[in-house]
Regions:
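Short, low-complexity N-terminal intrinsically disordered segments enriched in polar/charged residues
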Residues: 1-31, 129-132
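Hydrophobic pocket/interface hotspot
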Residues: 10-13, 24-26, 33, 55, ...
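Short, mixed-charge, low-aromatic patches
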Residues: 11-20, 43-46, 61-65, 87
Length: 132
């Protein structure tokens, strides 16, 4: 796929967060895909390396916190070859009325029109604070 097509695919992927679309997110990932989030897993349950299969429960748990989903605002997006890098921020309201606004740098690797690797850098302590 071209860099332009890869960037479009990543924008589409991020748009599914707004709808709480775990199924759609997983469908866009390759069967052997992995997703890594910075942080210490014993302090932040979403941290560490997860397989696509493990991401089902992670995404279900994430979307269960919110009234609708998370709006992902893309601030910058750069692509080269099979890699797309995104700087973004999220906006959402939890079911308990807390505002969730986090910052991200996410590195995507794509293969054959599917996302095969996600490396997400975010503020895990903000997530812990809001989701408790």
């Amino acid at each position: 796929m071209s860099v332009t097509a890869n960037k479009h695919l990543v924008r589409c992927f991020l748009s599914h967060f707004e709808k709480g679309g775990a199924n759609e997110l997983l469908e866009m990932m390759g069967d052997d895909a992995t997703w890594w989030v910075n942080g210490k897993p014993h302090l932040f349950a979403f941290a560490g390396l997860k397989t696509k299969a493990e991401m089902r429960s992670v995404l279900d748990e994430l979307f269960a916190f919110f009234n609708v989903g998370l709006q992902m605002e893309v601030r910058s997006l750069i692509g080269e070859g099979d890699i797309v890098a995104v700087e973004a921020c999220s906006h959402g309201v939890t079911k308990h009325g807390k505002r969730y606004e986090n910052e991200y740098h996410i590195l995507f690797r794509l293969r054959d029109g599917k996302i095969v690797d996600v490396r997400e850098y975010t503020d895990p302590m903000h997530a812990v604070e809001v989701m408790q």
